[in-house]
Design a protein with these regions (language model features):
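Catalytic cores of large soluble enzymes that bind and process phosphate-bearing ligands
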Residues: 51
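Acidic, metal-associated active-site segment
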Residues: 58
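Exposed, interaction-prone extracellular/peripheral surfaces
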Residues: 1-48, 61-66, 75, 84-120, ...
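N-terminal low-complexity, intrinsically disordered segments
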Residues: 69-79
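Small-residue-rich anion-binding loops in enzyme active sites
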Residues: 54-55
Length: 236
């Protein structure tokens, strides 16, 4: 990921224009790996993540290499030729991008502050979800506040999400006192449990400062019925 920066300030804070420009950096990115050769999925958004069903697409004549398990015997007998069922993948699923902007993130010694990198990663995740045809929403939080944006499949929603991230990012200030660990990360995960019932994708971007046994318990609980991607941001 390459983001042009004009001055040292950009290493600390992100701008809305910067996050919106990341839309064009997602074309080669995906939350999942490529499907194996010979995959039966005929949709353009094949996925190994849970929560996506296969929808019947059409009947067509058998072609060499087709999986015999998908032969439709009734249609084959009716037409006198082997016929197979083809499927497209259900594309729509809610994606929650969870971005940490606590004071523990307001530090960096090399490329950028952790808070700025988390903001960029959050925007990338949102653009990836939209490009995949999914609804995208967000939970953005700092030491005192937690904001939620309901998932929606639209570029306007991604812009609103990025704007909220920028708002939280610009509230960070080195003159602020270090916040005592108040269990905010666990509170955020509880919010995730409340909004993501089943078959959602949660992309959590944080330094995981203050994480403990309860945090792991909540993550496991969240992953029981959802896909969870946790990205830990740290300063080397």
């Amino acid at each position: 990921m390459h983001v042009a920066r004009q001055d040292a300030e950009a290493l600390v804070y992100v701008s809305l224009a910067q996050l919106m420009a990341l839309e064009f950096s997602t074309r080669a990115l995906s939350f999942v790996g490529r499907q194996p050769r010979g995959s039966l999925l005929s949709g353009s958004h094949a996925s190994r993540l849970r929560g996506r069903g296969l929808d019947f697409d059409e009947l067509r004549r058998y072609q060499p290499g087709d999986d015999l398990r998908h032969l439709d015997w009734r249609a084959s007998l009716r037409t006198g030729n082997p016929v197979v069922r083809t499927f497209t993948e259900e594309r729509d699923r809610p994606v929650w991008v969870v971005v940490d902007q606590r004071m523990s993130m307001f530090f960096g010694s090399t490329r950028s502050f952790k808070s700025a990198l988390a903001a960029e990663l959050g925007a990338l995740a949102a653009w990836m979800a939209l490009r995949a045809g999914d609804r995208v929403g967000a939970i953005v939080f700092n030491d005192q506040h937690i904001d939620s944006i309901t998932p929606l499949r639209s570029r306007t929603r991604v812009q609103a999400l990025c704007s909220r991230i920028v708002h939280y990012n610009h509230q960070l200030d080195a003159l602020q006192p270090d916040a005592e660990d108040s269990g905010q990360l666990d509170t955020v995960l509880q919010r995730c449990l409340a909004v993501a019932g089943h078959d959602h994708l949660i992309c959590l971007i944080s330094d995981f400062a203050g994480a403990g046994p309860r945090t792991l318990q909540l993550l496991r609980q969240l992953a029981t019925h959802n896909d969870v991607i946790a990205l830990q941001v740290y300063d080397p």
